[in-house]
Amino acid sequence: MAVSAKYDEFNHWWATEGDWVEEPNYRRNGMSGVQCVERNGKKLYVKRMTHHLFHSVRYPFGRPTIVREVAVIKELERAGVIVPKIVFGEAVKIEGEWRALLVTEDMAGFISIADWYAQHAVSPYSDEVRQAMLKAVALAFKKMHSINRQHGCCYVRHIYVKTEGNAEAGFLDLEKSRRRLRRDKAINHDFRQLEKYLEPIPKADWEQVKAYYYAM
């Protein structure tokens, strides 16, 4: 993308207004927030960040976390993991301040696994549907961990499922994801983190997810 075109598109999305789904959070001299907008009949999510950086040996002075998240989403997509489709993802430095944007399409038909269980409590799904959903969650984890990548922020609100038609599962909010040298480290981190705040997933259902996972 040419520099001028990149800046033009960045400025276009930066100026876009919508409803806040994650109110601006100001900390460490930076800001982060997510708005929902409509474009050409599609629901999009615009994540904005200023001065949210990660540091590494390669980037000792820091790089925007959105740059890393974009790379992670693309890597997981190549591995067959269901993740939000990227419309735009860039970071620019303006007058010494990093600004970063990630625009993604809504995961149409998917709901968080927490919302799925809330619906299940009101209008129970069949055991066949529930088992298909649990197996889909196991498969999503298996694909992610197969490339030694851990989610890094593994909570029920970040696991999305769809049970209309073929059951599917995927992930969002991947800015803290990282690659581990050993696969078991990624598995243990994600599973232990999720198990600390497992509700509303019943423990028996989670044990079934792990049974499917280790049988794959």
From Swiss-Prot:
Pfam families: Kdo. It comes from the Bacteria. Induction: By several factors in addition of internal pH. InterPro entries: Kinase-like_dom_sf, Put_LipoPS_kinase_InaA. GO terms for cellular component: plasma membrane. May be an environmental sensor responsive to several stimuli, including internal pH, proton motive force, temperature, and possibly other unknown factors. Belongs to the protein kinase superfamily. KdkA/RfaP family. This is Protein InaA. It comes from Escherichia coli (strain K12). The lineage of its organism: Bacteria, Pseudomonadati, Pseudomonadota, Gammaproteobacteria, Enterobacterales.
